[in-house]
Swiss-Prot record:
Belongs to the D-alanine--D-alanine ligase family. Keywords: ATP-binding, Cell shape, Cell wall biogenesis/degradation, Cytoplasm, Ligase, Magnesium, Manganese, Metal-binding, Nucleotide-binding, Peptidoglycan synthesis. This is D-alanine--D-alanine ligase. Its EC number is 6.3.2.4. Its cofactor is Mg(2+); Mn(2+). Mg(2+) 2 binds at E269, N271.
Length: 308
């Protein structure tokens, strides 16, 4: 009798994206159980190295969002223990998590990025650092947590940035606000997917809009001119390769169609462990390509390796 493959699904953790990670991880664990895998769900804590060393699974499915699972830290633990894992490796994870460094790499590779600065909270507190509208966001967090859009109506940056309980680090990315359509595209099995346009029911595609059913409308395929559509796909793969990503990644874009050609297309960021909840974009893109949720999750596990 063939032994069932034992997969550890790493979920939870202690980042600001914990709740999303729990939802993603549990959905994937359920899928693997339906496919006949032996599954252990691990809510990651600071003793994760000891837990994994004792458990010794055949592989690990990474369903952590934010620190420490998306920044290369847990990947380093898994490599030390010689446990194959999914998604991107140590370097690509660390690089993509640091938005300022990732932008530099992508720009060098010919992927257009938003004009911006990396500043401390103290520097931002002195007043407007660029002409509004602009965006202030943490250098190393996802799911749009800690993100503020500063418009002409703001006399000064939001005071929440300077409170003692601010949890998103002292270093912040300040970027010129890019108007236009919100687009996303993923890389699955080494190829770019189709493109989704996200239409938030609120002004900004924030945490609530991303993870609350009905808070945003997804247009798939996105309503774009064919050459723009293909350019989004090309840039998605280019960003994935430039950062050294593996497995699944997702790139987010803005497109200002008032600018001629593809000049209004800007890559905002690349997510190395995109969400896998019921409202997440990657499962929707995969389904459009004929890949069921369970098939997608199984492929992620089968793709796991120590060569990331």
């Amino acid at each position: 009798m063939t032994k069932r493959k034992h997969v550890a699904v790493l979920l939870g953790g202690w980042s600001s994206e914990r709740e999303v990670s729990l939802r993603s991880g549990n959905a994937c664990a359920d899928a693997l159980e339906r496919r006949g895998f032996e599954v252990t769900r691990i809510d990651v804590a600071r003793d994760i190295a000891t837990v994994l060393d004792q458990l010794r699974p055949d592989s690990a499915l990474m369903m952590l969002h934010g620190h420490p699972g998306e920044d290369g830290s847990i990947q380093g633990v898994l490599e030390t223990l010689a446990i194959p894992y999914s998604h991107s490796g140590v370097l690509a994870s660390a690089l993509a998590m640091q938005k300022d460094l990732a932008k530099t790499v992508m720009k060098t590779a010919g992927v257009p990025v938003a004009e911006g600065l990396t500043l401390s909270r103290d520097e931002i507190a002195r007043g407007h650092v660029m002409e509004p509208p602009y965006v202030i966001k943490p250098v190393a967090d996802g799911s749009s947590v800690g993100v503020y859009i500063i418009t002409e109506q703001h006399q000064h940056p939001p005071q929440e940035l300077f409170r003692d309980d601010w949890a998103y680090g002292d270093k912040l990315l300040v970027e010129k606000y890019v108007a236009g359509k919100e687009l996303t595209c993923a890389v699955v099995k080494g190829e770019p997917t189709d493109v989704i346009e996200i239409v938030p029911m609120v002004r900004f595609y924030d945490y609530e809009a991303k993870y609350s059913p009905g808070a945003s409308k997804h247009v798939l395929p996105a309503s774009l001119l064919p050459f723009v559509y293909q350019e989004v796909r090309r840039l998605t793969l280019a960003a994935h390769v430039a950062l050294g990503c593996r497995g699944v990644s997702r790139a987010d874009f803005r497109f200002d169609d008032r600018i001629e050609g593809t000049g209004g297309l800007v890559c905002l960021e690349v997510n190395t462990q995109p969400g896998m909840t019921e409202t997440s974009l990657v499962p929707e893109l995969a389904a459009y390509a004929g890949i069921t949720f369970d098939e997608l999750v199984q492929w992620m596990v089968e793709d796991a390796s120590l060569d990331r």
